[in-house]
Regions:
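N-terminal amphipathic, basic helical "cap/leader" segment at the start of enzyme domains
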Residues: 1-105, 203
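Conserved hydrophobic/aromatic beta-strand scaffold that supports enzyme active sites
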Residues: 26, 102, 109-111, 176-178, ...
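Small-aliphatic-rich amphipathic alpha-helix that forms the alpha element of a beta-alpha
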Residues: 55, 110, 116-164
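Short, charged/polar surface micro-motifs in flexible loops or helix N-caps
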Residues: 74-79, 85-86, 116-118, 159, ...
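A glycine-rich helix N-cap at a beta->alpha junction
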Residues: 100-102, 165-190
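Generic beta-strand structural signal
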Residues: 108, 144, 173-175
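Phosphate/diphosphate-binding glycine-rich loops and adjacent basic-rich segments that engage nucleotide
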Residues: 187-203
């Protein structure tokens, strides 16, 4: 599918931000789909490019872009999964190999790589920005009508797995965002009590 985003605002011009109540409706209903339920069709190349363009608009203190994207299309993802499976089985770890179903089954994935740089902007803030990229990418995919899930598993942290993905020593996987069409609508899960988690500060 070809997706046409609204024109990107021109640098230095005012950005009109009218209310979008439909966004509140979306957030009220937002629910991740289990990765193992995601099937074809998934986002095509034009849609993936648009999703990444949207995700790159997250808050980014210092304008450092302390993240990058690795697209795992069906061919690339299958090859990556095969190498991970060989790695796990070579270690005698069938449990780790079994966990690859979440990577194998969805049609497409995008790895969000945190690449924090030495800067006066604290490392924590740069990593938070990478997390915001994951969230925005997840939401944008769902707003486009796909199911999506933010996954981290052993292959997000394992040194050899990260090397297979092409990460530099200082880079970390903030998350794999897997996308596709859910076989069934996801069921609502229990949500936290936001009132109990909120306090009003007073001096």
């Amino acid at each position: 599918m070809t997706i046409a985003l609204p024109p990107t605002p021109v640098f230095g011009t005012p950005v009109d931000q009218p209310p979008h109540l439909e966004v509140l409706d979306f957030l009220t209903r937002r629910r991740s789909s289990s990765a193992v339920t995601l099937a074809e069709p998934g986002p095509g190349p034009d849609e993936i490019a648009a999703l990444i363009q949207l995700a790159a608009r997250v808050p980014d203190h210092g304008k450092l872009s302390p993240w990058r994207f690795i697209i795992l299309d069906s061919e690339g993802k299958a090859a990556f999964a095969a190498k991970l499976e060989a790695l796990a089985l070579g270690r005698g770890d069938p449990r780790a190999a079994a966990k690859l179903a979440k990577l194998k089954l969805p049609p497409v994935g995008i790895a969000v790589v945190s690449r924090a740089v030495a800067h006066e902007i604290p490392l924590w803030e740069q990593e938070l920005s990478a997390g915001a990229v994951c969230t925005t990418l997840l939401y944008a995919a769902q707003a486009l009508g796909y199911g999506a899930n933010w996954i981290t598993d052993w292959y997000a942290y394992d040194a050899q797995a990260k090397a297979l993905l092409g990460l530099a020593e200082h880079e970390r996987v903030a998350g794999f965002i897997f996308m596709g069409t859910p076989k069934d609508p996801p069921m609502e899960r229990e949500r936290p009590d936001s009132v109990a988690l909120t306090t009003l500060w007073r001096p």
